[in-house]
């Protein structure tokens, strides 16, 4: 993997990780169009550590508050407030993707990274996001969050294992279907992603140097630079998205997904871009 490839792919990762447009899908598309290869699931997972650090820093106060409340709540029942419950919801919501990620890790590395699968998921899931935006009441705030919401959003997060779906797209959509307000759906989805993405990145670190499939391999310095680029751009992206969702809806991202997906389907159908 050249330094130019590292910079471009890391930028794509950082800019799209938190947007409901699928960062893994964009990495697959960008690497196939510009570099005639696949960045690989391992490079994707490791570079996500940069965006993971970004979301941890952005939500640092929330994380400290939730952890503190959770620990105190375990010791003193009277301290079991909203933040205490939120800590449990994050734990509960993380379980589904951890289980499925372990069972289907080989499929994630290979078959589902076929560009036909990626682009189809990009287009089809646009309809799900649009429907969630249309039917979501957005009347429920954090005080009304329940463990059932955590289970549903956690299951929705497992859809992000398929490149092209989008982790934030699936969790925000699930939140909207449950009636959560748009900003809460996004914030809870990001908190839910922290343990899953961190575990995925560490688990995939060895494979990023020596891919088990035909992905592009990167050196240690290249992975470090990729992680730093993804961190800076990811921090910018998450701050922008949360401000954006306060005043705007998800249809903007739906339109973008359909436009990119349709264009890629044409390129694939005409043989301009190879699917594998």
UniProtKB/Swiss-Prot annotation:
Please state what the protein is called. Undecaprenyl-diphosphatase
Signal peptide start and end residues: none
UniProt key word Kinase: no
Annotated Gene Ontology cellular component terms: plasma membrane
> Which gene name does the record give?
uppP
**Organism whose genome encodes this protein:** Mycobacterium bovis (strain ATCC BAA-935 / AF2122/97)
For molecular function, the Gene Ontology terms on record are:
undecaprenyl-diphosphatase activity
Reactions this protein catalyses: di-trans,octa-cis-undecaprenyl diphosphate + H2O = di-trans,octa-cis-undecaprenyl phosphate + phosphate + H(+)
* NCBIfam families assigned to the protein according to its UniProt record, in alphabetical order: PRK00281.2-1 (NF001392), undec_PP_bacA (TIGR00753)
The record's comment on protein family reads:
Belongs to the UppP family.
Q: Could you confirm whether the keyword Membrane appears in this record?
A: yes
Q: Which PANTHER family match?
A: UNDECAPRENYL-DIPHOSPHATASE (PTHR30622:SF4)
InterPro entries noted in UniProt: UppP
